[in-house]
């Protein structure tokens, strides 16, 4: 019974901490697009600027494929 109460209190405390942290960090992230592009290039295999690309198989790190080349 004591263990159950301790687990319940711990879960409630962790949930409250996450909610407080999420509320405090709202609107503080700057340069969102830059971060998402960086995250995309680090998490997937993509082609650099000037490399051949296909609009069907979206695979450029820069996010744009023009005239068959990443740009």
Swiss-Prot record:
The modification 4-hydroxyproline is found at residue 52. It is found in: Secreted. One of its GO terms (cellular component) is extracellular region. GO terms for molecular function: calcium channel regulator activity; ion channel inhibitor activity; toxin activity. Keywords: Amidation, Calcium channel impairing toxin, Disulfide bond, Hydroxylation, Ion channel impairing toxin, Knottin, Neurotoxin, Secreted, Signal, Toxin, Voltage-gated calcium channel impairing toxin. This is Omega-conotoxin-like CnVIIE. Omega-conotoxins act at presynaptic membranes, they bind and block voltage-gated calcium channels (Cav). Expressed by the venom duct. The modification Cysteine amide is found at residue 70. Found in injectable (milked) (IV) venom. Disulfide bonds join 46-61, 53-65, 60-70. InterPro entries: Conotoxin, Conotoxin_omega-typ_CS. Pfam families: Conotoxin (PF02950). Belongs to the conotoxin M superfamily. The presence of a 'disulfide through disulfide knot' structurally defines this protein as a knottin. The cysteine framework is VI/VII (C-C-CC-C-C). It comes from Conus consors. PROSITE patterns: OMEGA_CONOTOXIN. Residues 23-45 form a propeptide. Residues 1-22 form the signal peptide.
